[in-house]
């Protein structure tokens, strides 16, 4: 009986000391972040570097450590203005995993520092590593952000790829969408 009591006590202590770190990370991550993810896109044999990135993490209220959102990379010298994706994300054992729904690709974010204002870390994509730095621009449920100001049509056309901007583009030509890549910084 004493052995059973000892085992139950050990089990209860283990449950008591279980970390809630993943829930804390997901809670802090929720919101819209902007900055530079140092992401590139390959298209037609050329690489184009994103000038900035905006990521919105929306937390699932029933699972606490996962959710959906949007990831938009903006470009200035590419045949398109931006590449937008829906994302599914989760936090497990301190690692943030992001799945790009339209592209069918995944990345991991590890070795990061995160607070309510700044998100700095490393993206892992098939052996490629790149550091990033994002800043929080909006957070749901904040006392100063309780209203939606105006109308924003950005959410109405997130499924579509930007058309080419060149004037001589053939409108009947099917344009292949760019492929997101993570390239290590050139030294």
Which residue ranges define each predicted feature?
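Positively charged n-region of N-terminal signal peptides that target proteins for export
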Residues: 1-4, 187
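Sec-dependent signal peptide hydrophobic core
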Residues: 5-12
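C-terminal motif of bacterial Sec signal peptides marking the signal peptidase cleavage site
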Residues: 15-19
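N-terminal helix-cap/turn-to-beta initiation motif at the start of protein domains
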Residues: 20-34
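Transition segment at domain starts
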Residues: 32-38, 43-52
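Generic short beta-strand segments
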Residues: 34-41, 66-74, 122-126
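N-terminal glycine/threonine-rich, aromatic-flanked beta-hairpin/loop signature
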Residues: 46-95, 179
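Beta-sheet ligand-binding and adhesion/scaffold domains
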Residues: 95-187
């Amino acid at each position: 009986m004493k052995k059973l009591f000892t085992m139950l006590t050990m089990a209860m202590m283990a449950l008591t000391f279980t970390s809630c770190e993943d829930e804390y990370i997901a809670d802090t991550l929720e919101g819209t972040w902007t900055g530079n993810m140092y992401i590139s896109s390959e298209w037609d044999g050329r690489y184009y570097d994103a000038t900035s990135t905006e990521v919105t993490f929306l937390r699932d209220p029933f699972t606490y450590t996962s959710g959906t959102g949007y990831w938009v990379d903006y470009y200035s010298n590419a045949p398109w203005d931006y590449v937008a994706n829906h994302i599914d994300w989760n936090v497990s054992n301190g690692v943030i995993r992001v799945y790009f729904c339209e592209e069918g690709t995944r990345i991991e974010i590890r070795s990061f520092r995160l607070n309510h204002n700044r998100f700095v870390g490393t993206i892992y994509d098939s052996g490629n590593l790149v550091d990033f730095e994002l800043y929080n621009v909006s957070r749901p449920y904040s006392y100063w952000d309780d209203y939606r100001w105006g109308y924003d049509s950005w959410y109405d056309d997130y499924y579509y790829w930007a058309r080419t901007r060149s004037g001589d583009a053939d409108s009947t030509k099917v344009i292949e969408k760019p492929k997101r890549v993570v390239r290590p910084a050139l030294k």
